[in-house]
Design a protein with these regions (language model features):
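A short beta-strand-turn-helix
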Residues: 46-64
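Short pre-active-site segment immediately N-terminal to redox-active cysteine/selenocysteine motifs
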Residues: 61-62, 68-72, 115
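Short cysteine-rich clusters marking metal-coordination/redox-active sites
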Residues: 10-13, 30-33
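Cys/His-rich microdomains that often coordinate metals
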Residues: 14-17, 37, 80
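Short linker/helix segments within small regulatory modules
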Residues: 19-29
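Conserved redox-active cysteine motifs that mediate thiol-disulfide chemistry
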Residues: 68-82
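Thiol-based oxidoreductase modules, predominantly thioredoxin-like and allied folds used
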Residues: 68, 83-106, 113
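Non-catalytic, surface beta->alpha helical segment in thiol-disulfide oxidoreductase systems
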Residues: 115, 121-149
Length: 149
């Protein structure tokens, strides 16, 4: 896959489809079964769990910004809308993933997440950067730019 194409799995037949980023808004269809591909999910954060983390984050063809949060955490709630905005802005270039650490303790333990919010940027299955605290949108975008560079 090149930087100007995405690989999208068809939710109907499971076939993998190469879709140019420039054509995402044209309602692309699966090359095998001709059903519409699930592009709407590219514009919102993906909820990940202990059992989906490796597939959604570590094996992603796109870089991923993972937001580790908990429902009782005020600063986590404050950055939620920022994550939604970033998912829209970087659609097709960066995946935003949200991990509730209270419900998914294995990943929190694996990556030594001891305070929240904690975010980390993953590219090609490797953690590139770990960010702790409710960072302003501008600072997050600066870190994202380094990864997308």
């Amino acid at each position: 896959m090149t930087a100007d194409k995405l690989i999208l799995a068809c939710s109907n037949c499971g076939a993998k489809n190469r879709v140019p980023i420039s054509r995402i808004d044209e309602a692309p269809k699966c090359g095998k079964c001709k059903k519409f591909l699930p592009v709407e999910s590219l514009s919102r954060p993906v909820i990940v769990m202990d059992n989906t983390f490796d597939r959604e984050v570590m094996s992603s063809s796109l870089p991923v910004l993972v937001d580790c949060w908990a429902p009782w955490c005020g600063p986590c709630k404050a950055i939620g809308p920022i994550m939604d905005e970033l998912a829209i802005k970087y659609r097709g270039r960066l995946k935003i993933a949200k991990l509730n650490v209270d419900e998914n303790p294995m990943i929190g333990s694996r990556y030594s997440i001891s305070s929240i919010p904690t975010m980390f940027l993953v590219k090609n299955g490797r953690i590139i950067d770990k960010l702790i605290g409710a960072l302003p949108k501008e600072q997050l975008e600066s870190q994202i730019a380094r990864v997308l560079g």
